[in-house]
Amino acid sequence: MHLTPRETEKLMLHYAGELARKRKERGLKLNYPEAVALISAELMEAARDGKTVTELMQYGAKILTRDDVMEGVDAMIHEIQIEATFPDGTKLVTVHNPIR
């Protein structure tokens, strides 16, 4: 199997998001990379499922709360930007203050 660099990056992000999800389910508080990976992976999957950019921007702010992350992580993440694949092409999605 030959993957482009972009496809490899998407797979790595998906795997990191899955690892973060499992840690969250075990009751662990997520660190910065885990929080970003989980939110990004969730947004990419929701885009693939057909949600709009606006829906993703709203959904991205509901995935994690301050109680889900280590102290100070929420203050470190001001925005998350991903390029997501939608049924009509690739678009940039920005979620401001994703952890509330």
Curated annotation (Swiss-Prot):
CDD domains: Urease_gamma (cd00390). GO terms for biological process: urea catabolic process. GO terms for molecular function: nickel cation binding; urease activity. It holds the Pfam family Urease_gamma. Gene3D superfamilies: Urease, gamma-like subunit. It catalyses: urea + 2 H2O + H(+) = hydrogencarbonate + 2 NH4(+). GO terms for cellular component: cytoplasm. Keywords: Cytoplasm, Hydrolase. Belongs to the urease gamma subunit family. This is Urease subunit gamma. It comes from Acetivibrio thermocellus (strain ATCC 27405 / DSM 1237 / JCM 9322 / NBRC 103400 / NCIMB 10682 / NRRL B-4536 / VPI 7372) (Clostridium thermocellum).
